[in-house]
């Protein structure tokens, strides 16, 4: 899993908004297309070689690169079809932005809470999180390895909803938007909440994402505390590849 961008809310210098490239030896999926992530994507895979795009929700920092990608696919690369999985609200927002249908090239499939899709050899399961708009956390599994992604959420959701058999996760990328003193003020997580949530989900590795600029060190220390994750915590740094 390669981090294309992990900035919360707005792009930071050198760090686009949310975007991840999830790959197996035979499959490549772009997970969330936040502002600025198309350029980094092309450093790792050609747009024509993508098997699908998965979008967690309609907030701009997670999806608004797609109108640019639509134009590039139609008018530059001449790509006829790219499968896209996302919420109905995301599709409607993007249709309004482009002023018309998304297809071609985006062959859109609406997904919602409880949906499952298979892309190549990677399975994707979706669970609606605690966020003001329909937002889907993601469980991606291939070859016996499991990756979890919180997208945006508050505390009234848990990774166990993606893992009913309690098998755990090899890697979780979890948002940690809020400073500790703002706990509960928005439907986002503090680093302590993220750490505790991922410990309860039996995550073997945790990487924090969706943070504001310059707070990463403090957030990691909060998440590593005994009452949180209780072990080493990483950050989703742009350009870094996690092997799951």
What are these regions (language model features)?
Residues 9-58, 64-74, 155-164:
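Pre-active-site segment of Zn-dependent metallo-hydrolases
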Residues 30-34, 51-61, 87, 148-153, ...:
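Active-site neighborhood of phospho(di)ester-bond hydrolases with catalytic His/Asp-centered motifs
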């Amino acid at each position: 899993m390669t981090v294309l961008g992990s900035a919360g809310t707005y792009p930071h210098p050198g760090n686009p908004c949310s975007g991840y490239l999830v790959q197996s030896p035979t499959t490549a999926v772009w997970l969330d297309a936040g502002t600025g992530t198309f350029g980094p994507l092309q450093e790792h895979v050609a747009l024509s070689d993508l098997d699908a795009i998965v979008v967690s929700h309609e907030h701009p920092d997670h999806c608004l690169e797609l109108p640019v990608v639509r134009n590039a696919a139609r008018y530059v690369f001449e790509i006829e079809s790219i499968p896209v999985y996302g919420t109905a609200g995301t599709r409607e927002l993007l249709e309004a932005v482009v002023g018309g249908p998304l297809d071609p090239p985006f062959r859109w499939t609406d997904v919602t809470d409880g949906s499952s899709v298979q892309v190549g050899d990677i399975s994707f399961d979706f669970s609606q999180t605690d966020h003001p708009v329909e937002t889907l956390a993601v469980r991606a599994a291939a070859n016996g390895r499991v990756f979890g992604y919180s997208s945006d959420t508050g505390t009234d959701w848990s990774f166990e909803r993606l893992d009913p058999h309690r098998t755990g996760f090899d890697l979780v990328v979890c948002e940690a938007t809020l400073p500790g003193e703002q706990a509960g003020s928005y439907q986002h997580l503090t680093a302590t909440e993220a750490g505790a949530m991922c410990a309860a989900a039996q995550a073997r590795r945790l990487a924090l994402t969706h943070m504001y600029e310059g707070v990463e060190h403090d957030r990691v220390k909060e998440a590593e505390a005994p009452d949180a994750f209780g072990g080493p915590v990483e950050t989703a740094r742009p350009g870094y590849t996690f092997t799951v």
